Amino acid sequence: MLLAININNTETKVGLFRGDSLESHWRLTTTPQRTPDEWASTLTSYLAQAGRSTQEVRAAIVASVVPPVTQGLCEAVERATTVAPAVVDGRSQLPITLDVEEPLQVGADRILNTLAAAQLFRRDTIVVDFGTATTFDCITADGHFLGGVIMPGIRTASDALIRGTAKLPATDLAPPTRTIGRRTDEAIRAGVLLGTADAVDGLVRRIKAEWPNGKAPHVIATGGLASLVAPLAREIEAVHPDLTLTGLRIAAGALGLTW
């Protein structure tokens, strides 16, 4: 089996693949203070809950945008499974071209999202990933990563609003039923979610206007909050919640791993 781990600023997502099939997955809080032993214990526990043993893991692959966590988690994977994980970054030999000015600065999650899109859809695609940041990443049908846009994520914006104002309450993010909020929590939901949806639509239209070949790219969404925003955004055509993990699986194959 393949153990695939994507370390993001807020959450770490772990997936277990049998062949090309994602058999199980789970989310952990990204905690830089965790020791390799603690990470190893956590991974072992989650594998057991999934009905799997660490001995069934034949290959492992890690992507990270949190350098302080990367080494410890890689050590944890090797301790738990005896398998040294491959690590994906801008130097990895993958079947896409990072056609940008600073390829080594492109986040691993952005690389994986566009790799998955290129391999799955074989068409020009914009991937909108709703994470700690909301990213818009552009990949052509022939696998050229063109760059993209990065804006504050939904929870990042919401948390900043709450922290920066004395009287606004913390509010659960739920779909707003109207734009004009009759209560403060309604007004916050409308501002954060409808504001994000309209920002997505506006930025996607701007990206389409700059697209090099004049074709209309496919627009897909991924990330933990994609299903919340997608119904509110006119430009999003489909949601693929496990796109980054799929990218890790594709990267593992491209790097010669077997499982």
Q: Which stretches of residues belong to each language-model region?
A:
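ATP-binding/phosphotransfer module of carbohydrate and carboxylate kinases, centering on a glycine-rich
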Residues: 2-4, 158-259
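Short glycine-rich, Thr/Ser-proximal phosphate-binding strand/loop in the N-terminal lobe
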Residues: 2-48, 143-169, 174-178
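Short glycine-aspartate micro-motif
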Residues: 2-6, 61, 125-129, 220
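Phosphate/pyrophosphate-binding loops at sites that engage ATP/ADP/AMP, CoA/4′-phosphopantetheine
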Residues: 43-59, 203-215
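Phosphate-bearing ligand-interacting subdomains
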Residues: 47-78
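Short Gly/Thr/Asp-enriched flexible loops that form oxyanion-binding sites at enzyme active sites
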Residues: 71-78, 137-146, 232
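A short helix->loop->beta-strand "cap" motif at the edges of active sites that frequently abuts
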Residues: 81-84, 217
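Phosphate-binding/catalytic loop of phosphoryl-transfer enzymes
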Residues: 83-87, 92-164, 193-208, 228, ...
